[in-house]
Regions:
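N-terminal secretory signal peptides that target proteins for export/translocation
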Residues: 1-14
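Bacterial N-terminal signal peptides
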Residues: 17-31
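Sec/Tat signal peptide C-region and signal peptidase I cleavage site
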Residues: 32-36
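PDZ/PDZ-like peptide-tail recognition elements
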Residues: 37-86, 90, 128
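PDZ-domain C-terminal substructure recognizer with occasional recognition of PDZ-binding tails
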Residues: 38-49, 98, 103, 109, ...
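A structural micro-motif recognizing beta-strand termini
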Residues: 90-94, 152
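Short strand-turn-strand beta-turns centered on an Asx-Gly dipeptide
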Residues: 111-114
């Protein structure tokens, strides 16, 4: 039987130089990457002044969501949704909202199949959540749609 030996076409020394070159290229490009990352961290929605309300049943504090210039600029290229709704400003860690996965910064736009345009309408719909059936809550997180089911 003839033994075959595997021959390397790239030596370890050459591979190491390629790794170093890649690391240097990434270090050189990192200022551009961090700028894009910083833009992604800017808020997409803010609270409309004097619009805060609370949903005691779900355990969230809401305000009417107002889209920012960042969202307007990123909506088309990043395929982000622009909707009216209620921005969650805080979540009680012991409430059903936190248990269901809602977090600060989420924008609720539909509850139980009904669109909500502001914090007052969202709080009313959230306070109707019952104990016998799940209620679907649609929301945006960083401009992307999600949904959860809540029940008392």
């Amino acid at each position: 039987m003839h033994k075959h030996r595997c021959h390397r076409f790239v030596s370890r020394h050459t591979a190491w130089h390629g790794t170093v070159a890649l690391a240097l290229a990434l270090a050189f490009l990192s200022p551009g990457i961090s700028v894009a990352g910083q833009e992604a961290d800017l808020p997409l929605y803010t609270c409309l002044a004097d619009s805060e309300t609370t949903s005691g049943i779900v355990g969230v504090q809401l305000c009417t969501a107002e889209h920012t210039e960042t969202l307007v600029n990123r909506s088309e290229p990043d395929n982000l949704q622009v909707r009216r709704g209620a921005l969650i400003s805080s979540v009680d860690a012991t409430g059903i909202g936190a248990t269901g996965g809602l977090t600060d910064g989420d924008v609720i736009y539909r509850i139980g199949g009904n669109d909500v345009a502001d914090a007052g309408a969202a709080a009313q719909e959230l306070d109707r959540i019952g104990t016998s059936a799940d209620t679907v809550v649609n929301f945006l997180r960083k401009g992307r749609p999600y949904r959860i089911k809540l029940r008392q």
